[in-house]
A protein has these predicted regions:
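Short, solvent-exposed beta-strand/turn "edge" segments of beta-rich domains on protein surfaces
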Residues: 60-62, 78-86, 147-153
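Short C-terminal domain-edge/linker segments immediately following a structured domain
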Residues: 99-107, 122-128, 188-200
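Acidic-leaning, charged glycine-interspersed low-complexity segments
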Residues: 64, 106-171
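Extracellular/virion structural assembly segments
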Residues: 11, 83-88, 96-124
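Short, cysteine-centered beta-strand-loop-beta hairpins and adjacent loop/turn segments enriched
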Residues: 78-81, 98-104, 165-171
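Oligomerization/assembly interface segments of phage tail-like spikes and tubes
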Residues: 85-100, 152-166
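C-terminal tail/extension regions appended to the core domain(s) of diverse proteins
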Residues: 155-205
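Small/polar-rich, solvent-exposed N-terminal microdomains that initiate assembly or binding
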Residues: 1-81, 183-205
């Protein structure tokens, strides 16, 4: 039985993936010596929602020294422009970092958040990227908490408003591959917690 079609009108998924693809060249470390690039991260990815709780960090920090996760938080304004549905989307980019090469996690997170904000505001940078307008109301906020600090992680959030079409079809080829996940289970009260980071095989060529 074939998989049914899934309508995407009103969705921010395509917009969020557009932001991810825009930011990757500015924020991801790549190529030889990537593990020594302190002011970049290993991965920029789309996230399902707010990312500010210590409980989430085990899943996303596995085998990483930091990352950036992009989420659409709300759409405070939507309107039809001709035959197209356009929304003003409130995005948040969560920058999370651990210490690296003896550079402090809080300094890394703040520096990368600044690099991210600067990339968002490059004049003409969004031409041809799918957005209707350049970002507005760009802000950065320190999400320090005792819980995240105990996990050895610092988090900064960069937020902004940006107009995007909301009825663009989702391209499965642009979505993150589900290749790794964090498993956690309690077998019984008081029993040891079973935890594991599981890597799945990649797609068959």
């Amino acid at each position: 039985m074939s998989r049914p079609d899934f309508g995407t009108i009103g969705s921010t998924v395509s917009a969020c993936e557009g932001v991810v693809q825009y930011l990757k060249p500015y924020l991801e470390a790549a190529g030889p010596g990537a593990d020594r690039v302190v002011d970049r991260v290993q991965t920029v990815e789309r996230h399902i929602g707010q990312f500010d709780k210590a409980e989430e960090l085990d899943e996303w920090m596995s085998n990483k020294d930091g990352g950036v996760r992009i989420a659409a938080l709300q759409i405070p304004k939507m309107e039809n422009q001709g035959s197209e549905l356009v929304g003003t989307v409130e995005f948040a980019a969560y920058v999370f970092c651990a210490d690296m090469w003896a550079y402090a996690k809080d300094q890394r997170a703040e520096v990368i958040a600044g690099r991210l904000a600067k990339a968002l505001m490059i004049k003409g940078g969004w031409v041809g990227k799918g957005a209707k307008k350049a970002p507005e109301s760009v802000q950065a906020r320190n999400l320090y908490s005792i819980q995240t600090n105990k996990k050895g992680v610092a988090i900064w959030a960069v937020t902004w408003l940006q107009d995007w079409p909301l009825d663009d079809p989702i391209d499965p080829a642009t979505l993150d591959d589900f290749l790794r996940f964090n498993f956690k289970a309690e077998l019984a009260d008081g029993a040891p917690v079973c935890k594991a980071d599981i890597t799945l095989p990649g797609p068959t060529p």
